[in-house]
């Protein structure tokens, strides 16, 4: 012990090169590649997760009609933007719906019109990119008609990846115009380049101020009107009101001013809404007929894919919604989409769709058809389309 070797070094003095060396740190390139690979794995996982609820289930299974949105849609329009919303430079006067008289006495405006039905529901992929896109004023609006099939048309269109629509009825151009366009825009869903923003409020078609107001927003707005046999539409309208207020008078008593003389009471909105030619005249003062598409409510039942093809063409969209998206629900008697938007499960519109209509006296129906016939013929001429109601 303590003996020194030649050269004056202790036996414990071992050359450093004989000791094990720590591994060299990985070069920066390896770290970057590892981080990039990890990020790619996370992105791929999120993409596949999103597609599981969206790519495999584009269409939505919904019945025809204009009722409330399917229950799976989450709320999105409950609040207005923070702070005081910008307003138009004037206080807009109350809109003047052409419906009046008995309708006001009955309080027949349904809850579906009075409050938002169900707000917009983004698909899983759009939720993943919720920070993307921007809110735009609508480029297309379904303006009517009540009980014509507007809800079904909107839900069918929402299957299309290039259509983004607000689920509730905004009622901006008839009830909330004084809140301003900034408030209206904030109700809309976010869209990406190439997507169309839409909304539907059937009461616009019978509101005198609506054509000028929409034109002031944009003269290029595309307008869609879903129309239906006015007699059937009136009975459906009455049936909806009856379900809310069972104590209202009979359809027959509301239809006539004087049944003996056969005078139809056009102050009742259920009758007045069906005078399509009269309402269309107001719209043609502000929009050319080429900017309006008239969809047959009857064909939405008998040939939904065909009617949706016309709508997609009108909106400049690729024909993605086709026959393969639909099946016929024998219980309800309506076509449905095979899969709901953002879901792999079938779903039809609510229980209020396909209500059984009350029995109406055949003589009343005959007189109503006689009343509507000249208006229908004029409507056919104005639109260039025979809807075959007579």
UniProtKB/Swiss-Prot annotation:
Residue stretches of biased makeup (Low complexity): 123-133
Gene Ontology biological process terms in this record: branching involved in ureteric bud morphogenesis; glycosaminoglycan biosynthetic process; heparan sulfate proteoglycan biosynthetic process
Keyword Iron among UniProt keywords: no
Distribution of this protein across tissues and organs: Ubiquitous. Most abundant in liver and placenta, followed by heart and kidney.
InterPro entries, alphabetized: NST/OST, P-loop_NTPase, Sulfotransferase_dom
Chain positions carrying an annotated carbohydrate: 258, 329
Residues spanning the membrane: 33-53
Membrane topology: Single-pass type II membrane protein
GO CC terms, sorted: Golgi membrane; plasma membrane
Intrachain disulfide bonds: 336-348
Keyword annotations: Disulfide bond, Glycoprotein, Golgi apparatus, Membrane, Signal-anchor, Transferase, Transmembrane, Transmembrane helix
Entry GO MF terms: [heparan sulfate]-glucosamine 3-sulfotransferase activity
Ranges of compositional bias, category Pro residues: 83-96
Cell compartment(s), UniProt: Golgi apparatus membrane
Residues noted as binding 3'-phosphoadenylyl sulfate in the record, renumbered to the chain: 147-151, 228, 236, 353-357
Chain segments carrying region Disordered: 1-25, 74-133
Catalytic activity, EC: 2.8.2.30
Topological domains annotated Lumenal: 54-390
Pfam family, one: Sulfotransfer_1
Role: Sulfotransferase that utilizes 3'-phospho-5'-adenylyl sulfate (PAPS) to catalyze the transfer of a sulfo group to an N-unsubstituted glucosamine linked to a 2-O-sulfo iduronic acid unit on heparan sulfate. Catalyzes the O-sulfation of glucosamine in IdoUA2S-GlcNS and also in IdoUA2S-GlcNH2. The substrate-specific O-sulfation generates an enzyme-modified heparan sulfate which acts as a binding receptor to Herpes simplex virus-1 (HSV-1) and permits its entry. Unlike HS3ST1/3-OST-1, does not convert non-anticoagulant heparan sulfate to anticoagulant heparan sulfate.
Family listed: Belongs to the sulfotransferase 1 family.
Record protein name field: Heparan sulfate glucosamine 3-O-sulfotransferase 3B1
UniProt source species: Homo sapiens (Human)
């Amino acid at each position: 012990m303590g003996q020194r070797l030649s050269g004056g070094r202790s036996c414990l003095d071992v050359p450093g090169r004989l000791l094990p060396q720590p591994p060299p740190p990985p070069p920066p390139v390896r770290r970057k590649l590892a981080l990039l690979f990890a990020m790619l794995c996370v992105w791929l996982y999120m993409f596949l997760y999103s597609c599981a609820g969206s790519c495999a289930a584009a269409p939505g299974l919904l019945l025809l009609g204009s009722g409330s949105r399917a229950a799976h849609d989450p709320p999105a329009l409950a609040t207005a933007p923070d702070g005081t919303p910008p307003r138009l430079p004037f206080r807009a006067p109350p809109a003047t719906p052409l419906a009046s008289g008995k309708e006001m006495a009955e309080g027949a405006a349904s809850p579906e019109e009075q409050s938002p039905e169900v707000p917009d529901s983004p698909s899983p992929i759009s939720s993943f990119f919720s920070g993307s896109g921007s809110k735009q004023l609508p480029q297309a609006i379904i303006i009517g008609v009540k009980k014509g099939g507007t809800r079904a048309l909107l839900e069918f269109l929402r299957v299309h990846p290039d259509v983004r629509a607000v689920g509730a009825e905004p009622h901006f151009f008839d009830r909330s115009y004084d809140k301003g366009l900034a408030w209206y825009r904030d109700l809309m869903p976010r869209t990406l380049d190439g997507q169309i923003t839409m909304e539907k409020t059937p009461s616009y078609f019978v509101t005198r101020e609506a054509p000028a107001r929409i034109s002031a927003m944009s003269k290029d707005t595309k307008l869609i009107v879903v129309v239906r046999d006015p007699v059937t539409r009136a009975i459906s309208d009455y049936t909806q009101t009856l379900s809310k207020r069972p104590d209202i008078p009979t359809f027959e008593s509301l239809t006539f001013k004087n049944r003996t003389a056969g005078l139809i009471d056009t102050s009742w909105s259920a009758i007045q809404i069906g005078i399509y030619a009269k309402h269309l005249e107001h719209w043609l003062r502000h929009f050319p007929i080429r900017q309006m598409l008239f969809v047959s409510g009857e064909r939405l039942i008998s040939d939904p894919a065909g009617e949706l093809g016309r709508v997609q063409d009108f909106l400049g969209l690729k024909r993605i919604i086709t026959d393969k998206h639909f099946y016929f629900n024998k219980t309800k008697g309506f076509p449905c989409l095979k899969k709901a938007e953002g879901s792999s499960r079938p779903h039809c519109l609510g229980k209020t769709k396909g209500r059984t209509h009350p029995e109406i006296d055949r003589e009343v129906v005959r007189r109503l058809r006689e009343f509507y016939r000249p208006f229908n013929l004029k409507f056919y001429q104005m639109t260039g389309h025979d809807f075959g109601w007579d």
